[in-house]
Amino acid sequence: MTSVTGPLLDAHYQRSFGVLAGYLPEDRSGLAAWHAVIREKAAQLRNDQGPGYANQAVQDLANLIDTNGIVRMYVAEAIDQTSAFMKNIKNIQDMLEQLDFICTTAPEYNVNKKLRVLFPMSALFVDMMATPAGKALFRLEPFNEALRAILQTWAAYLDSQASCWVLNRDLNIGWLGTAAIAEFKLADFVIDWDAEYGGFQSYNDFFHREIQASCRPLAGEGDANIITSPNDGTVYRIATDVQQSAVFWIKEQSYSLQDMLANPDAALLQRFVEAR
């Protein structure tokens, strides 16, 4: 099977949402370093676990790959087609073991942006998704349903108190450390600095933290002509003259109002066409 060239994989990686938003390191060597650590921890989890996987959803994906020849073919080919660059996934078992470990951990802050991985599953699949086999694989409903169950498993962990271990005051890797406080302007949020874990009950509780009423007032509140994102995040792109419909598919260049607004009535849609 022909491998995707290194330059093409790198170009896809640099255009990925994770890199542009700062959730994945721009330097791919940082991604490789993360994989090396995850692989070691995943091997330890597998050794402790014994036969099978720690998470049933990962075991179900393993069973799907074993019993569905089409899924197995595309998974194997997608991994093989990344071999022109740093092969961060060695084989199917390695992919499953890394997934199994990811489901039992929360994203750690890292003051060094070259080593920061805040989207672990995106980090795992970013190269596979750039390959011809990967593009076919991630369109297969059985594979996507299996991944959905894995994401739900991981979400349950992130909603649990077990995920609070990353909410610490470490200067370099703590979400409540001085570096993170400055970078993410945590003083603007409702945080109980006297309580353990800042008073948060889980990583997701911290991730969805409340902004203090006196900070960042909402512009255009009550004005139906304005759409304001309620999320606190990184601006991905500012676009003008957006059309009613466009080929956009993968967060690249064009945006489609019809799709972003979930097929609204024509009158509402036209209010935003080519708006600035």
Residue spans for each PLM region:
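Generic N-terminal leader/targeting and pre-domain segments
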Residues: M1-M73
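Extended, domain-scale alpha-helical bundle/helix-rich regions
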Residues: A76-W249
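Basic, polyanion-binding surface patches
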Residues: W249, S254-R276
